[in-house]
């Protein structure tokens, strides 16, 4: 099974880590993780960690382009993933649901929980896949997100990046819009 989409980040205490897309079975996604160290102009592997399973993994077949950010105001880590329900590579894009999911944890290794209790789906990002957080403030319930448009966004947007989008999270209205999925 493919490992792809590596993302490097520093923890709150300055440790270098990596996460990437992985799977624990053909239809169950996970996020792989590793602790790294800088060695001159190289990066070396310190430890390959266990796969991080997502609390709602049964809602998707792939968790791609994982990115982890630290929120210094709350002390929480945020993990943003692009999720889809693709069953096989030959499946037409029109049959595949692509969404962004957000999780939070006190540790960069998890355990992870949906940002909204039972809700991980981020609203307001239709047509995007592989987005990044430009800014985040969990205490204010505010994210600024940018990402590439997919083919489903239409020919005028495909292969372009969105303008930054403000996403308000943590409110009851937001949770109701996002739905339990």
Residue ranges, per PLM feature:
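Carbohydrate-active catalytic/glycan-binding domains of CAZyme proteins
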Residues: 1-181
